[in-house]
A protein has these predicted regions:
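Long, positively charged amphipathic alpha-helical accessory segments at protein N-termini or as interdomain linkers
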Residues: 5, 67-72, 76-97, 107-228
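N-terminal lobe of the biotin/lipoate ligase/transferase fold
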Residues: 1-92, 158
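Short loop/edge segments at beta-strand edges and connector loops
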Residues: 10, 99-101
Length: 228
């Protein structure tokens, strides 16, 4: 990746949507990040809402175009992004921090970060990607979200959100240089996988007994279900 341009806004419905709008109007170029103090329509995987207090957390989206990226290697983007966010969070806390498949980050068994990746595909190639990331930095109260946490909640230390952003950009640069190295990215991802070899986990909202074996090259997770 080349130098990343940072655009800061006070508030927006969604940093992903804001980026997409700017891309369509041709007002931004490759390797641009939008960072917001607040977003009032943020969402995560499966259209779940992402709630964040004003100015307390890192809310950002990266626009990137990877030349000649085949659709068959699409999961490499998720691997690289998940590892980038994981490494960023681990920079600031000592608690156990892992990737919950497909791309949530958990610290001390609670969600500290969420990722939403939107890819445009043309002629079996990834035309561009918008990578939305939320990292809970200084927020202490999470109404109706008992399984959420933040860096400050775990360390009792206030952080400048921009410092977290710059660390994330540094890690994006590191892992996107390895974007075509599926073996490296997948090994790193599996080494940091939450619930690996675990005997109980949630599957489609139900607690089942089984064992998470690993994540595969296509991004799917291999699970061994124990018979009753």
């Amino acid at each position: 990746m080349s130098t990343i341009k940072i655009i800061k806004v006070n508030a927006t419905k969604s940093t992903n949507s804001k980026l997409r709008m700017l891309i369509k109007s041709k007002k931004i170029h490759n390797n641009t990040i939008i960072s917001a103090n607040y977003q009032y329509g943020g969402r995560g995987q499966s259209d779940k809402r992402w709630f964040s207090s004003y100015g307390k957390n890192l809310i950002c989206s990266l626009y990137i175009n990877i030349p000649d990226m085949r659709q068959s290697c699409l999961q490499n983007i998720n691997f690289a992004v998940s590892l980038s966010v994981l490494k960023t969070v681990k920079k600031f806390i000592n608690n156990s921090t892992l990737i919950k498949w497909p791309n949530d980050i958990l610290s001390a068994n609670k969600k500290i970060s969420g990722i939403l990746i939107e890819n445009s595909i043309k002629s079996n190639k990834v035309y561009d990607s918008i990578i939305g990331t939320g990292i809970n930095v200084n927020q202490l109260v999470f109404k109706s979200l008992p399984k959420a946490t933040s860096i400050k909640k775990l360390t009792n230390k206030e952080l400048n959100v921009d410092i977290v952003l710059y660390e994330l950009i540094k890690n994006y640069n590191f892992y996107f240089l390895k974007i075509r190295n599926t073996k490296y990215l997948l090994n790193q991802y599996n080494e940091n996988l939450y619930g690996l070899n675990k005997c109980k986990f949630l599957l489609e909202g139900e607690i089942v007994k089984g064992k998470i074996i690993r994540v595969l090259e296509n991004g799917k997770i291999r699970v061994e279900i124990f018979s009753h």
